[in-house]
Structures are given as C-alpha cells and as structure tokens.
Amino acid sequence: RGSNLTHPLRNIRDLFYVG
C-alpha cells in the first residue's frame, strides 16, 4: 500500500484482495 498513485489499478485490486 502507498503506491496507489503510481499504480491506481493495484489499489483497486488490493480492495478485492482484502475483501
């Protein structure tokens, strides 16, 4: 987490991974 600016898509994927 923290690189959502450089990897916005990864931030969204993280939400699915956590959920």
UniProtKB/Swiss-Prot annotation:
Its top-level enzyme class, in one word, is hydrolase
The glycosylation sites annotated in the UniProt record are 4
Give any GO molecular function from the UniProt entry: aspartic-type endopeptidase activity
* Listed GO biological process terms: proteolysis
Protein location? Secreted, Extracellular space
Supply the alphabetized keyword list.
Aspartyl protease, Glycoprotein, Hydrolase, Protease, Secreted
Ubl conjugation keyword on record:
no
Source organism superkingdom: Eukaryota
Write down any Gene Ontology CC term. Answer: extracellular region
Q: In which tissues is it expressed?
A: Chorionic epithelium (trophectoderm) and placental cotyledons.
| EC number from the UniProt entry | 3.4.23.-
The miscellaneous remark of the record is: On the 2D-gel the determined pI of this protein is: 6, its MW is: 71 kDa.
Q: Which family does it belong to?
A: Belongs to the peptidase A1 family.
Q: What is this protein called?
A: Pregnancy-associated glycoprotein 71G
Q: What organism is the protein native to?
A: Bison bonasus (European bison)
